[in-house]
Regions:
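A short beta-strand-loop structural module common to alpha/beta enzyme folds
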Residues: 47-59
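S-adenosyl-L-methionine
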Residues: 59-97
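Short strand-turn motif at the edge of the Rossmann-like AdoMet-binding core
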Residues: 52-54, 108, 133, 137-141
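Conserved beta-strand signature within the Rossmann-like core of class I S-adenosyl-L-methionine
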Residues: 47, 120, 130-138
Length: 211
């Protein structure tokens, strides 16, 4: 459920860890339903940049709701980018001069995606604002518990801020997709999972970091 706060200047709307006052980059969003859940809660997508590795043509082949979700996001003012590779996204023409308060990567669930997590830490750290955070939502049962996400993050000078339980019902309309094979448009059971939050090591102990 979205929560609205009046900070005296403008209304700030929150959905769990995310607010309309933050500049948010969502990476690898499948059918873009997570980004749409945020934009809907905020009443605007102006603070969102939603990305996918897929081209627009491939996106529409893989996901039945992709066209609709992208259209809604763009109508709400979100920036939607296709063909964005996490390995060099900080050099992307539309991203290289952008800095974010939150960078979000949900469910890198396939085994090969462990290296993608390593890559996102390595590139996203260069795209964070002061006190910004990288959020990776990930399954926590074996074999995913063996990935050592905190260790992967530390290789990019990132420190864990918090490990928060993830409940998909907190994000109405979000449909987690397999993303590969002939079942790419099917949801998958997420089971036990958490959102792991990281910041640059030198901000980890700064009392003014949270907002």
């Amino acid at each position: 459920m979205a929560v609205t706060w009046n900070d005296g200047a403008a209304l700030t709307k929150w959905l769990k860890h995310y607010s309309s006052a933050q500049d948010i980059l969502i990476v690898g969003d499948g059918d873009f339903s997570f980004s749409l859940a945020l934009a809907t809660a905020f009443g605007s997508g102006a603070n969102l940049v939603a990305t996918s590795l897929d081209s627009y043509a491939d996106l529409n082949i893989k996901y039945s709701d992709a066209t609709s979700n992208v259209t809604k996001l763009e109508a709400m003012g979100a920036t939607v980018l296709h063909g964005v590779d996490v390995k060099d996204m900080n050099l992307h023409a539309n991203l290289q001069l952008r800095w974010f308060d939150r960078i979000v990567f949900n469910f890198p669930h396939a085994g090969s995606h462990k290296e993608l997590v390593r890559s996102i830490f390595a590139t996203a750290r260069h795209m964070l604002r002061r006190h910004g955070e990288i959020h990776v939502t990930h399954k926590t049962k074996h074999p995913y518990s063996m990935w050592g996400i905190e260790q992967l993050a530390s290789q990019s000078s990132l420190a864990m801020v918090e490990q928060a339980a993830f409940q998909i019902q907190d994000y109405p309309g979000y449909n987690q997709k397999r993303g590969s094979s002939w079942r790419c448009d099917q949801d998958f059971a997420i089971g036990d999972c958490c959102t792991f939050k990281f910041c640059l090591e030198w901000w980890a102990s700064d009392d003014d970091r949270f907002f």
